[in-house]
A protein has these predicted regions:
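Short amphipathic alpha-helix segments
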Residues: 217-223
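Common nucleic-acid-contacting/processivity interface regions adjacent to the catalytic cores
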Residues: 1-85, 91, 170-217
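Conserved small/polar residues in nucleotide/adenosyl-binding loops
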Residues: 224-229
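Conserved hydrophobic/aromatic pocket- or pore-lining residues that grip, position, or stack substrates
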Residues: 149, 189, 220
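Conserved catalytic alpha/beta cores of large enzymes that bind or transform nucleotide phosphates
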Residues: 97-143, 150
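Non-transmembrane amphipathic alpha-helical segments
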Residues: 145-159, 185
Length: 234
């Protein structure tokens, strides 16, 4: 928590929640670019939105069980689709036009996909469009924080390897410091989505939150439909 508070320029108590921490992170990021942030509005969460994909378990005893983890899934999807409140164009397509299920079954009308390809935009599985001509502040922050995490995780692994070779006790402090920093970066990355879907957040937007979750559903479900030596069973 102390590492996150120092890095985000926030009070210690602010990192125990999600919205205040990310509000200040975004403020400092935009201030460097001379961009004025919008006024905070009182917003009520009146609608529900699709969450993460949860596969129904296959009850029984199984051999050769495996698991997989998509590296920083939501942060990478934010970067991939350029998902950000100010890059959101709107949602011209409804569930009958596009959804995770329709994309998996190739049931989206060709004229919709052809039209998207002609424009400089991305289309998320909830039918939302995001502009690509300018990078959003959320993808920019995701990229910066992710790159920092990769850097400090590499330094931690290098310090661990050096300690194995030399047994120098001083390296333990380096290992602990680098691990602490990279873990703080990881928590920061994964908490951004939670802020977007929180109605107390300055940049709260259900379309943006759902764009992230449905894109995650699509990525995970594609693993089950991709050709492989053995069908994935869960």
């Amino acid at each position: 928590c102390l590492t996150m508070a120092y890095d985000g320029k926030v009070n210690y108590g602010d990192v125990l929640g999600t919205t205040k921490y990310w509000d200040i992170l975004i403020y400092n990021h935009l201030r460097k670019k001379n961009i004025v942030i919008p006024q905070k509005k009182d917003q009520k969460k009146s609608e529900k939105y699709e969450g993460a994909y949860v596969k129904e378990p296959l009850v029984g005893m199984h051999k050769w069980v495996m698991s997989f983890d998509l590296n920083s899934l939501y942060p990478h999807l934010i970067m991939q689709y350029n998902i950000s409140p100010e890059t959101l164009i709107g949602r011209p397509f409804k569930d009958k036009d596009i959804s995770v299920d329709k994309l998996l079954k190739n049931e989206v009308k060709s004229d919709i996909l052809d039209g998207i390809k002609k424009q400089d935009v991305t289309l998320t599985p909830n039918g939302a469009l995001f502009r690509k001509d300018k990078k959003g502040f959320l993808p920019e922050l995701m990229q910066t924080i992710y790159d920092d995490r990769v850097k400090y995780k590499r330094l931690m692994l290098e310090a661990k390897q050096e300690y194995e070779n030399t047994k120098d006790p001083k390296l333990k402090k380096d290992i602990s410091r680098y691990d602490n920093i990279q873990m703080a970066k990881k928590i920061s990355l994964n908490s951004a989505y939670g802020a977007i879907g929180n109605n107390w957040f300055r940049y709260y937007n259900l379309l943006v939150a759902e764009a992230i979750t449905t894109s995650g559903q699509l990525s995970i479900c594609l693993l089950y439909t991709s050709p492989s030596p053995r069908d994935l069973q869960g």
